[in-house]
UniProtKB/Swiss-Prot annotation:
Assembly, per entry: Myosin is a hexamer of 2 heavy chains and 4 light chains.
GO molecular function, one term: calcium ion binding
Name recorded for this polypeptide: Myosin light chain 3, skeletal muscle isoform
GO cellular component term, pick one: contractile muscle fiber
TM helices/strands, residue ranges: none
Span of domain EF-hand: 6-41, 44-79, 83-118, 118-150
Modifications after synthesis and translation: The N-terminus is blocked.
Length: 150
């Protein structure tokens, strides 16, 4: 997949929104956020691989230009391992004890905080905000739509 000139201009605009110092550069730690803001869904492990597995110090100190970032975005876009809507719904269906399209909010919180790419409590709360019904249940298809649009 290659990008059109218009897409590249849009990507550069988004990239520059993350530039905190006005030098048209971002830190490596921001790459995942920008890639996700541009519609890709790579895991943190995939981002680290694309970045060449930098140290924590490099993640916060090393800066890159848009020209260095674009091939990284390309690599994320070309990765066929990204989960689809159906993949995520299928993964959550395992926790649907009643078979009614919902999962318990408490159980989903636990899963997000302890399995796979573990999320912090704050990240989980931010993601779950407004998703539970009065019984503490979450419609997981609506939840997946929500997280894929964030």
């Amino acid at each position: 997949m290659s990008f059109s000139p218009d897409e590249i201009n849009d990507f550069k605009e988004a990239f520059l929104l993350f530039d905190r110092t006005g030098d048209a550069k971002i830190t490596l730690s921001q790459v995942g956020d920008i890639v996700r803001a541009l519609g890709q869904n790579p895991t943190n492990a995939e981002i680290n691989k694309i970045l060449g597995n930098p140290s924590k110090e490099e993640m916060n100190a090393k800066k890159i230009t848009f020209e260095e970032f674009l091939p990284m975005l390309q690599a994320a876009a070309n990765n066929k391992d990204q989960g689809t809507f159906e993949d995520f719904v299928e993964g959550l269906r395992v926790f649907d004890k009643e078979g009614n399209g919902t999962v318990m909010g408490a159980e989903l919180r636990h899963v997000l905080a302890t399995l796979g790419e573990k999320m912090t409590e704050e990240e989980v709360e931010e993601l779950m905000k407004g998703q539970e019904d009065s019984n503490g249940c979450i419609n997981y298809e609506a939840f997946v739509k929500h997280i894929m649009s964030v």
